[in-house]
Structure formats: C-alpha cells, structure tokens
Curated annotation (Swiss-Prot):
InterPro entries: RNA_pol_I_trans_ini_fac_RRN3. PANTHER family: RNA POLYMERASE I-SPECIFIC TRANSCRIPTION INITIATION FACTOR RRN3-RELATED, TRANSCRIPTION INITIATION FACTOR IA RRN3. It holds the Pfam family RRN3. One of its GO terms (biological process) is transcription initiation at RNA polymerase I promoter. GO terms for molecular function: RNA polymerase I general transcription initiation factor activity. The lineage of its organism: Eukaryota, Metazoa, Chordata, Craniata, Vertebrata. It comes from Homo sapiens. Belongs to the RRN3 family. This is Putative RRN3-like protein RRN3P1.
Length: 152
C-alpha cells in the first residue's frame, strides 16, 4: 500500500468511526473528497473503490435513518453524512470524464450503480447542505450526461 492509499484509509477510518467527534469525521470526509478529486497522481483504480466505500456508507446511513425520527435535514445531527455526500459529489465533478469514459452506455453503468438518486432525494436533502458550487456543478454534469434532467 502506498502513502496515498494509507492516507485515504486513515481518513476513511476517521470518517466512519462514530466514537470520533463529528468535527473530526467531517474534516476526514472533506479531505477524502479533496484528495480524490484534485490529486492528479491518484488513479481511477483508487478513486472508484473509494467512491464505492463512501456511497455504500451513505446508503447504509440512509437505511438506518429511514425508520428513525431524526430523518430530516440537520447538519448538527448528520454532519458526517453531509461531508461524505460532498466528498462524493466533489469527486464526481472532477473525475466524471474518467468515470464515464468509453462507450456512453457502458460509461453510465458505473454512476447508475451508485444510485445517486436515492441519496439526493432522501429526506436528509444533501443538496441543500452541500456547498452550492459543488451542488450546481454536480447537477449540471448529471443533467448533461443523462441527455435531459434526471438521475440516471
């Protein structure tokens, strides 16, 4: 394992550990997103599994919220969730060309498998909380790549 992968693993452990303070978890999520999105030396072979981990964690988080009374938009309650959402959206914004490369139909299979629709349409409403610039770019890219408005 290289330094970059070890750093990502360290950040991932901090993000998903509920015993860590929320601010530490959120900072870890923010670093993951920035690192995956902007570090040119991070290959797609590393980016995809990290996105898979983040998105899977988001879906599990949503599963746990579906039956609860705290399933509403609140940064104080769900800060690490929103941080992970922004990490995913930010990474997708900067890596979408690589993630969608090749045949359009085949290229769309990967983002479809992530089920962004469930995340963005959830009661936690991450598009309301994440940075507007990230949300706007994410929405524009998903709209453009689907040839019309919609979430794969």
């Amino acid at each position: 394992m290289g330094f970059a992968e070890a750093f990502l693993e360290h950040l991932w452990k901090n993000l998903q550990d509920p015993s860590n303070p929320a601010i530490i978890r959120q900072a870890a999520g923010n670093y993951i997103g920035s690192f995956l999105a902007r570090a040119k030396f991070i290959s797609l072979i590393t980016v995809k599994p990290c996105l898979d981990l983040l998105v899977n964690w988001l879906h599990i988080y949503l599963n746990n919220q579906d039956s609860g009374t705290k399933a509403f938009c609140d940064v104080a309650l769900h800060g690490p969730f929103y941080s992970a959402c922004q990490a995913v959206f930010y990474t997708f914004v900067f890596r979408h060309k690589q993630l969608l490369s090749g045949n359009l139909k085949e290229g769309l299979q990967y983002p479809q498998s992530l089920n962004f629709e469930r995340i963005v349409m959830s009661q936690l409403n991450p598009l309301k909380i994440c940075l507007p610039s990230v949300v706007n770019f994410f929405a524009a890219i998903t709209k453009m790549k689907t040839c019309g408005y919609g979430w794969w």
